[in-house]
């Protein structure tokens, strides 16, 4: 898989005024974006992705986890509807069963859903890795990074998932948002540390390891938790979401900060202190500002407006991979 650890972008669709899927795919390609993540199967979008050359992360609806987990035939029909018809012409990177459902009432559904999807894909002769996407709220301890552990609420679910993924060599997807840590406690977190703008290692020295930015510190806390939970040092992480809002009234939400974070990120994702030299496959959140998301910063994570004009410029050719 050499050369695929590029920068992808999440294509959210919670907007009433978004461009047609074919225009969106063309916009990805025009901006040298190599990969796309979609949160649920949409056949119009999958049609537009045919022969596009884009790598695709395909999510399931969280509401589909229950039937996917309990009914192998439902998983088979899901694969038959959304993967099989496109498999030759769409480059599926991963299928992620559920987004940020651990910990919670649906958490126990994730691994059975993953296994049923894996069996359905195998029966269809398709080799697409199946994983899930977690928020960093699964961590009980995240500071310092080497002490990272999963919370007592998350560990009973996450532990078996981590072991399962490690045995198949499939990465775990994690959503990493320094913005929310910064905006919740701006007096304790330096802005340049959150924005990946610091030229000096600041704020965190962990067993002699220096962290110059929060993105690496959060990732390494998850790596430490994964290792403690039985994933060993072989299980890789993919950052399935990260972003910074350009407006919406949140503390530190500005076009200037969003542009700094995303451009610094594109240049940066070449490895963390705990996993040096290993490029981190990363998906920015998000392609567009989406007017059907909750009001405030949630509507302002896009790099583009719905009319396809830039909110701020991102140079994707600068990717460190």
Curated annotation (Swiss-Prot):
Catalysed reactions, as listed in the record: Hydrolysis of (1->3)-beta-D-glucosidic linkages in (1->3)-beta-D-glucans
Keywords: Glycosidase, Hydrolase, Plant defense, Signal
Cited InterPro entries: Glyco_hydro_17, Glyco_hydro_17_plant, Glycoside_hydrolase_SF
Signal peptide: 1-6
Superkingdom: Eukaryota
EC number: 3.2.1.39
GO molecular function: glucan endo-1,3-beta-D-glucosidase activity
Gene Ontology annotations of biological process type: carbohydrate metabolic process; defense response
Pfam families cross-referenced by the UniProt entry: Glyco_hydro_17 (PF00332)
SUPFAM superfamilies: (Trans)glycosidases
Catalytic residues of the enzyme: 100 (proton donor), 241 (nucleophile)
Gene3D superfamilies attached to this UniProt entry: Glycosidases (3.20.20.80)
Enzyme class: hydrolase
Similarity field: Belongs to the glycosyl hydrolase 17 family.
The protein's role, per its UniProt record: May provide a degree of protection against microbial invasion of germinated barley grain through its ability to degrade fungal cell wall polysaccharides.
Name recorded for this polypeptide: Putative glucan endo-1,3-beta-glucosidase GVI
UniProt source species: Hordeum vulgare
């Amino acid at each position: 898989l050499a050369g695929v650890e590029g920068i992808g972008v999440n294509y959210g669709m919670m907007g009433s005024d978004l461009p047609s899927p074919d225009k969106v795919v063309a916009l990805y390609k025009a901006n040298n974006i190599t990969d796309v993540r979609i949160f649920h199967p949409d056949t119009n979008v999958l049609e537009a992705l045919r022969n596009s050359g884009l790598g695709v992360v395909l999510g399931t609806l969280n509401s589909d986890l229950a039937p996917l987990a309990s009914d192998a035939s439902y998983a088979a029909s899901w694969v038959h509807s959304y993967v099989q018809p496109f498999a030759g012409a769409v480059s599926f990177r991963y299928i992620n069963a559920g987004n940020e459902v651990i910990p919670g009432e649906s958490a126990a559904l994730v691994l059975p859903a993953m296994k049923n999807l894996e069996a359905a894909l195998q029966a269809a002769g398709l080799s697409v890795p199946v994983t899930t996407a977690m928020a960093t709220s699964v961590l009980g301890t995240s500071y310092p990074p080497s002490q990272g552990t999963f919370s007592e609420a998350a560990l009973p679910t996450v532990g078996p998932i981590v072991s399962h993924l490690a045995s198949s060599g499939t990465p775990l997807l994690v959503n990493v948002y320094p913005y929310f840590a910064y905006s919740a406690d701006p007096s304790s977190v330096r802005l340049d540390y959150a924005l990946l703008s610091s030229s000096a290692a600041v704020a965190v020295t962990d067993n002699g390891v220096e962290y110059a930015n929060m993105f690496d510190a959060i990732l390494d806390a998850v790596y430490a938790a994964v290792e403690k939970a039985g994933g060993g040092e072989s299980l890789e992480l993919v950052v399935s979401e990260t972003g910074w809002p350009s407006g919406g009234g949140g503390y530190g939400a500005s076009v200037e900060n969003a542009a700094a974070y995303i451009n610094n990120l594109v240049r940066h994702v070449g490895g963390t202190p705990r996993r040096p030299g290993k490029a981190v496959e990363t998906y920015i959140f998000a392609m567009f500002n989406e007017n059907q998301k909750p009001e405030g910063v949630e509507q302002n994570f896009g790099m583009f407006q719905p009319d396809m004009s830039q909110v701020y410029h991102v140079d994707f050719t600068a990717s460190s991979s």
